[in-house]
Amino acid sequence: MYKRQYLDVPKEWLGQPFIDEAEHLKEIRPEAYEHEYMGIANGNGGAVFEYVEVREITDEEIAQMDRIYQGVDWGWYPDKYAFTRTYYDVARETIYFIDEHCVNKRSNEQTADWIKKKGYNDYAIICDSAEPKSVEDYRNLGLVAQAAVKGPGSVEYGMKWLQRRKIVIDPRRTPYAYKEITTYEYDRDKDGNIISGYPDRDNHAIDSLRYAYNRVIMRRGENA
């Protein structure tokens, strides 16, 4: 309740960190501020990711990106293997999708070879920890692969962190991630009401993205 009516609450009750966070969000993303702190509905109500900008990301932009995060969601068939490479603009709390590799029926050797041929062994890759052998395979193949840290509520925690960020995506560069990010919606009951929780389907690139930022999320918390 305080978050949605915080201007009516004495500042000393909320604390300066809360006020600073609200004002920071107001400055960098007014629409997110209005939704989260003022209670103004400004989305379609069903989309999980509301702060998405679809546009061309140029080679010149990418050349200047130096805070790179990479993640892997293991898969075979019918579930896809998904690798994503993104950039995080900390000051503006914005994620940019740079590249992806989302495929079926590829061995660890084949996907590792793709990563190395693209030159993407320049940064660590945070992987789904559910397959420790695959993580070890990547390490043996010369990649800096690390297992994501998981715990109770880690999926919800990570998803909320991503939801608060703006996501910039170029359909030409990352068509699979584009489709997932822009169509991923909450489930609804028979009466059309939204069901809490995140559907575990059509979300392989999304899971890869969540793993990529695992260290940031766990280190700095949901409101980082």
Could you say what each language-model-derived stretch is?
Residues P199-A224:
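Charge-patterned, long linear interaction tracts outside catalytic cores
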Residues D73-G75, H101, A130, L209:
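Anionic group-transfer/hydrolysis microenvironments
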Residues M1-Q5:
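Conserved small/polar residues in nucleotide/adenosyl-binding loops
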Residues E31, H35, P175, N203-I206:
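Non-catalytic, well-ordered alpha-helical scaffold segments
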Residues K11-G75:
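ATPase catalytic-site recognition across NTP-hydrolyzing enzymes
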